[in-house]
Amino acid sequence: MTRPGFLVITAVACVLGIAVAAACGHGPNVWTALTTVVLAVLMHAAANVLNDYHDALNGADDANTQGLFPFTGGARLIQNGHVTVQDTHDLAKALILFLIPCGLWLAVQTGGGLIVLGMVGLLLGWGYSAPPLVLMKRGLG
């Protein structure tokens, strides 16, 4: 459900951003940097799980039988009977409920701008395949 192979992209992007900041003279706090990478990866995982959940509800992954795995058709764990739609919903909810207070803590450590970024990330992660936004059907994802 979380599609770990793609989570590496998020981790690399965060580490690159931390490295650029350090090169520009903004040496990172190791704990804050590590927390940033972990939370970014978990947020990406939450978005993937939300996508699998909503695609199962709207039938998008069921209809995608000719897709190029792993790039289309989701993780296929629901479709192959390994997890239920409810399990997927519960994991997405647990990840989000964990991420919100952790993200708020990180924002307090680093500045309020992170709150806006986190809220936009949650909105886009949810809105990618969830109604009423369903951004993927609008060519926005």
Question: Where do the protein language model's features map onto the residues?
Answer:
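Aspartate-rich (DDxxD/NDxxD/DxxxD) Mg2+/diphosphate-binding motifs
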Residues: 47-95
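Membrane-helix interface segments
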Residues: 28-31, 60, 85-86, 112-113
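Membrane-interfacial segments
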Residues: 24, 54-58, 111-114, 134
